[in-house]
Amino acid sequence: MLRIADKTFDSHLFTGTGKFASSQLMVEAIRASGSQLVTLAMKRVDLRQHNDAILAPLIEAGVTLLPNTSGAKTAEEAIFAAQLAREALGTNWLKLEIHPDARWLLPDPIETLKAAEALVKQGFVVLPYCGADPVLCKRLEEVGCAAVMPLGAPIGSNQGLETKTMLEIIIQQATVPVVVDAGIGVPSHAAQALEMGADAVLVNTAIAVADDPVMMATAFRLAVEAGLLARQAVPGNRSTYASATSPLTGFLEALA
């Protein structure tokens, strides 16, 4: 069970809505993933119409919507987009994204922190997408963010947990949930994140661009469950030296 702010989730896999070939395929993949929290870019939906091709099936599916501010380049733009989303969707939950460079889509740490502080004061439940910077994540936590969402690698790159060392520090020091976001390309990346101690992962591109998104969504669901179970089971310690599982000493002595 995962708790963020005033909501609890059985699934530790969050999903996105971009890049799917159709709305129907998107919904089928989300259902297969077991995800209960789904992000959607406000620039891709008509917030005035609940029968929007993307929004309507999500509402029907009963998932928690997490509008994001993707496309915002400044704190001011993100705050304005957040206010529009709250008015249109009736939710104060927000994935805060500010990336001024469309080529790399890396989050702006200064604008993100500024916007996060302002939005928390306005009553938003803020989940900021940010770099894997332990100091920044701590600052975001201190201004009241409900979780932090550090990247594993650039958005849509499928590179995996390239920031593993920094993620480990963030996880160790965090007192709010840590959701690894961006760069997760295959289910084993998601399992690794949960094994490390992350509370959840957010996956979009890896599912949406797969030849079979529904099958890939299922694979991610199972991987997240496996990673969480492995962590709860408490793996054995790593060792430089070998340790035989079936020592021969007693056996050979008995034959002598």
UniProtKB/Swiss-Prot annotation:
UniProt-recorded Gene Ontology molecular function terms: thiazole synthase activity
Organism: Salmonella enteritidis PT4 (strain P125109)
UniProt cross-references to Pfam families, sorted A to Z: ThiG
Protein name: Thiazole synthase
Family of this protein: Belongs to the ThiG family.
Transferase found in the keyword field: yes
Domain of life, per lineage: Bacteria
Active site: K95
Gene: thiG
S-adenosyl-L-methionine is among the record's keywords: no
Alphabetized UniProt keyword annotations: Cytoplasm, Schiff base, Thiamine biosynthesis, Transferase
Known pathway: Cofactor biosynthesis; thiamine diphosphate biosynthesis
A single GO cellular-component term on record: cytoplasm
UniProt-annotated location(s): Cytoplasm
Enzyme Commission number: 2.8.1.10
Function (record text): Catalyzes the rearrangement of 1-deoxy-D-xylulose 5-phosphate (DXP) to produce the thiazole phosphate moiety of thiamine. Sulfur is provided by the thiocarboxylate moiety of the carrier protein ThiS. In vitro, sulfur can be provided by H(2)S.
Residues that bind 1-deoxy-D-xylulose 5-phosphate: G156, A182, G183, N204, T205
Biological process, per Gene Ontology: thiamine diphosphate biosynthetic process
Summary of subunit composition and partner proteins: Homotetramer. Forms heterodimers with either ThiH or ThiS.
InterPro entries: Aldolase_TIM (IPR013785), Thiazole_synthase_ThiG (IPR033983), ThiG (IPR008867)
Reactions the enzyme catalyzes: [ThiS sulfur-carrier protein]-C-terminal-Gly-aminoethanethioate + 2-iminoacetate + 1-deoxy-D-xylulose 5-phosphate = [ThiS sulfur-carrier protein]-C-terminal Gly-Gly + 2-[(2R,5Z)-2-carboxy-4-methylthiazol-5(2H)-ylidene]ethyl phosphate + 2 H2O + H(+)
SUPFAM superfamilies per UniProt: ThiG-like
